[in-house]
Amino acid sequence: MKKFLATMLLMVVASVSATIFAGTPIKQSELPKAAQSFITKYFPKDQVRKVEKDNGRRGMEYEVDFTSGAEADFTSDGNWKKVKAAHGTSVPSAIVPTAIAKYVATNFKGQTIVEISRKRGGYEVELSNGSELKLTEDAKPMQPRQGGRGQRR
């Protein structure tokens, strides 16, 4: 009986959490203009399956899912934050900084970039073999941030 009640409580908490943290569905036309332009330019043949807005840590954020399986996240002003390619494809090459594209081509022959995220000080990229790289815009390894939350000096 205790296990049953504990399981039920866990299910209720999970359900409430999923509802609280889920984004609010919106129409594609409600995205910031920059995000709409990005979709038109880099995903011209793909159809939008779902668009959600969410109040993130840095303000309003938007998530777009495409029918191909690709995904794109945008900041409140419509700049891309993260792009994930559809299975078996790579992210649009035009959004990858040239130095990073050259670095990957030279050091990871045969691999493609399947996901790219903008991070403070650079980019995080995931390659088709599962490798993850954290690089500055000029393809240098990103240094760990100093003095972050929970760290003591």
Where are these regions (language model features)?
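Conserved histidines in hydrophobic membrane contexts and catalytic metal-binding motifs
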Residues: E61-D65, Y123-E126, G130-E132
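Boundary at the C-terminal end of the N-terminal hydrophobic targeting segment
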Residues: A18-A22
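Bacterial N-terminal signal peptides
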Residues: T7-S17
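N-terminal, post-signal-peptide region of Sec/Tat-exported proteins
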Residues: D46-K82
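Residue-level detector of conserved, function-critical positions
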Residues: E115-I116
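Short, non-transmembrane alpha-helical segments in secretory-pathway proteins
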Residues: I26-V48, V91-T112
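Disordered, low-complexity segments in secreted/periplasmic proteins that are enriched in proline
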Residues: R145-R153
